[in-house]
């Protein structure tokens, strides 16, 4: 327990208003003296409980819920009433509840957002209010915000445009910053930019709570986002801003525009890439191979897939390959087939990842013919197969068996969310490779039984990366998030892998260990920030103390009454 946690907290609120503040409310855990001092007598049942007793009751209530969506709604109601209790409950049941507060259940919660809405959380910034964004930010009840997660809801998981329902993603993401990375909920703020929706189901839904208008795009959209960014810089100049679930047409351009202007990153592009590279590095270490020796095929060439590919290329270069050599080991397949330089419909960020058609002469086919996934597997002979397509079943039995025919222990990563959109299930992949493949998925899966072996499945979850990045940035007071910091995070994650440290188990650590993993990642990220001049240099002791001081644990502090 830190010295801060031992000290009493001076609180100017009292009576019913105190009970309505989720950051301060202790419910039945207010002591007798606190009930007297804060005018709470008669507002709570007589018995005074510990947080352990409250958590036990909450968990028993949780178990009465019939569906995952009901469980999500229940947990969110606790969060909106008592954040300390919510995070203690989450802390004690993290592996069980992470799929409920975030993927895959959060996808359904986003779809049903207007129907299950209970109370306010975060900021809704609508296009019609664009001239009042500074006023809106001043309305935030939290003054010392250190992390903002913002979405425009156009690409929510694999579900597409969800309008303001996308608010469920920043809320869930920030819950994981706290649960996994120890960042106080008092420092976090979820934001949705309501620029309308092109989802006809929402536009025609009488219960939809967002701006009922087609999406703003082009120059109007860019101007609106810039108004928001500039207002954020004025309100919280040192904040870490995370872009979340923007469509690929906007995600990369926004990141490129603002990455050198404020401390920001895009988790879909950079966080996904970092955890994927960390997984690859762990698999390579376990097999006694180098990342630079691998050949990687992607299915899905959007901003997330291309972001992963670029970070793999950077990691290969760190192992001695030049850029051209590294790029020749990456094969990107989308709906049109393998990306090649003779395609006329390539997006800006895809050009550098397209293979030269002239180099593929031995593959057969005429100029302009599509090269489908199976043909790429046969000719490129990859050792790693990564799916970010959002299309169920693309990793067919024929594809996986062809992959396995030339690689004894391939790494297969069907990363698409939610579970219904995964390219292949771990059971299928392991059945088709005689249990020899290494598997990491984007959604949670139970261990798989193959013969007499029970094989744990690593969830290649961004929650292994972004909480540690956030903690490291806050502790070091870094002013930017760089590619070097992301690579440091990936290496730190790989070094925590059970298959590396113990020689067996899953490719990634158990979720039960994620808070300690986040601390290790935070140290690596902070040291890299210092090495690059993005944070003031300190001794290791001072840095470790800063990380511990910023690592919040859900426990109640004693309260003392004060005035404003």
Curated annotation (Swiss-Prot):
Q: Which domain of life is it from?
A: Bacteria
What cofactor does this one take?
Mg(2+); Mn(2+)
Q: Where a divalent metal cation is bound, by residue?
A: 244-245, 268
**What's an example Gene Ontology biological process for this entry?**
pyruvate metabolic process
Q: What is the lineage of its organism?
A: Bacteria, Pseudomonadati, Pseudomonadota, Gammaproteobacteria, Pseudomonadales
> Active-site residues?
102, 173
* Catalytic reaction equation(s): (S)-malate + NAD(+) = pyruvate + CO2 + NADH; oxaloacetate + H(+) = pyruvate + CO2
Which EC number(s) does the record attach to this protein? Answer: 1.1.1.38
* GO function terms (MF aspect): malate dehydrogenase (decarboxylating) (NAD+) activity; malic enzyme activity; metal ion binding; NAD binding; oxaloacetate decarboxylase activity
Which NCBIfam families did the record assign? PRK13529.1 (NF010052)
* GO CC field: cytosol
Residue numbers binding NAD(+): 155, 268, 417
Details of cofactor binding:
Divalent metal cations. Prefers magnesium or manganese.
- Hey, which family's this protein in? Belongs to the malic enzymes family.
Swiss-Prot/TrEMBL site (Important for activity) positions: 268
Q: Which UniProt keywords apply?
A: Metal-binding, NAD, Oxidoreductase
* Stated name of the protein: NAD-dependent malic enzyme
Q: Which gene encodes it?
A: maeA
- Organism the protein comes from: Pseudomonas aeruginosa (strain ATCC 15692 / DSM 22644 / CIP 104116 / JCM 14847 / LMG 12228 / 1C / PRS 101 / PAO1)
**UniProt keyword Calcium, yes or no:** no
**Record's subunit section:** Homotetramer.
């Amino acid at each position: 327990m830190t010295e801060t946690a031992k000290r009493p907290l001076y609180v100017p609120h009292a009576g019913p208003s105190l009970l309505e503040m989720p950051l301060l409310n202790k419910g039945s855990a207010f002591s007798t003296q606190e009930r007297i001092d804060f005018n709470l007598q008669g507002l709570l049942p007589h018995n005074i409980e510990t947080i352990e007793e409250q958590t036990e009751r909450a968990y028993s209530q949780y178990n009465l819920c019939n569906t995952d969506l009901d469980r999500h709604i229940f947990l969110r109601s606790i969060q909106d009433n008592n954040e300390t209790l919510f995070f203690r409950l989450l802390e004690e049941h993290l592996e069980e509840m992470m799929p409920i507060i975030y993927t895959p259940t959060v996808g359904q919660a986003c779809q049903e957002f207007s129907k299950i809405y209970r109370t306010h959380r975060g900021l809704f910034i609508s296009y019609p209010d664009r001239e009042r964004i500074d006023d809106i930010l001043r309305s935030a009840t939290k003054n010392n915000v250190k992390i903002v997660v913002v979405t425009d809801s156009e690409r929510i998981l694999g579900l597409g445009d969800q309008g303001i329902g996308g608010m469920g993603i920043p809320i869930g993401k920030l819950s994981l910053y706290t649960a996994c990375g120890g960042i106080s909920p008092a420092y976090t703020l979820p934001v949705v930019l309501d620029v309308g929706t092109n989802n006809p189901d929402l536009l025609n839904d009488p219960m939809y709570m967002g701006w009922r208008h087609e999406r703003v795009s082009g120059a109007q959209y860019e101007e609106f986002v810039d108004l928001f960014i500039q207002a954020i810089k004025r309100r919280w100049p040192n904040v870490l801003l995370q872009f979340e679930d923007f469509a690929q047409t906007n995600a990369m351009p926004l990141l490129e525009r603002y990455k050198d202007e404020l401390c920001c990153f895009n988790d879909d592009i950079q966080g996904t890439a970092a955890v994927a590279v960390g997984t690859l590095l762990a698999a390579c270490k376990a097999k006694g191979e180098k990342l630079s020796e691998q050949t990687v095929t992607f299915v899905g060439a959007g901003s997330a897939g291309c972001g992963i590919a670029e970070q793999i290329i950077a990691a290969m270069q760190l192992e001695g390959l030049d850029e051209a050599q590294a790029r020749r080991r990456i094969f990107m397949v989308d709906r049109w087939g393998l990306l090649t330089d003779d395609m006329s419909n390539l997006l800006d960020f895809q050009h550098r990842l397209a293979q030269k058609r002239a180099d593929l002469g031995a593959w057969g086919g005429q100029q302009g013919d599509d090269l489908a996934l199976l043909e790429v597997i046969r000719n490129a002979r990859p050792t790693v197969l990564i799916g970010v397509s959002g299309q169920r079943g693309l990793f067919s039995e024929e594809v996986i068996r062809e992959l396995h025919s030339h690689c004894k222990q391939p790494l297969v990563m069907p990363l698409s969310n939610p579970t219904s959109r995964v390219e292949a299930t771990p059971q299928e992949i392991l059945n088709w490779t005689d249990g020899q493949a290494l598997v990491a998925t984007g959604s949670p899966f139970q261990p798989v039984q193959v013969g007499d072996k029970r094989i744990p499945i690593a969830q290649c979850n961004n929650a292994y990366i972004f909480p540690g990045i956030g903690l490291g940035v806050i502790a070091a007071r870094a002013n930017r998030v760089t590619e070097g910091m992301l690579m440091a995070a990936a290496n730190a994650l790989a070094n925590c892998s059970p298959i590396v440290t113990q020689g067996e188990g899953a490719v990634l650590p158990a979720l039960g260990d994620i808070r300690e993993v986040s601390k290790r990642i935070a140290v690596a990220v902070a040291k890299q920030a210092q090495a690059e001049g993005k944070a003031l240099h300190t001794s290791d002791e001072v840095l470790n103390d800063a990380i511990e001081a910023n690592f919040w644990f859900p426990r109640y502090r004693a309260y003392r009454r004060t005035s404003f």
